[in-house]
Amino acid sequence: MKRYENRSGHGGVTGYEILPDSIVLEFNDKDEYLYDYSKPGREQVEQMKILAERGEGLTTYVNQHVRDNYRKKLNKKASHF
């Protein structure tokens, strides 16, 4: 899991892990969510990967375009950081 830079200083995403056909996002509450090509879809996942690497706009994108359309909520974990 890599730390999300969050250049804007606002937002709920704290970390991410990019996989070939998916991305895992960690949020402020330490919950992790898997987004993949089947849900929410390839276009959204690829855009999320770009924003994650850029360190800006990911939380806004998730809130506006993805919301609860994730593949799976993963077990709550202790922070990776």
Which residues does each PLM region occupy?
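A charge-rich, low-complexity, intrinsically flexible signal that marks solvent-exposed coils, linkers
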Residues: 1-81
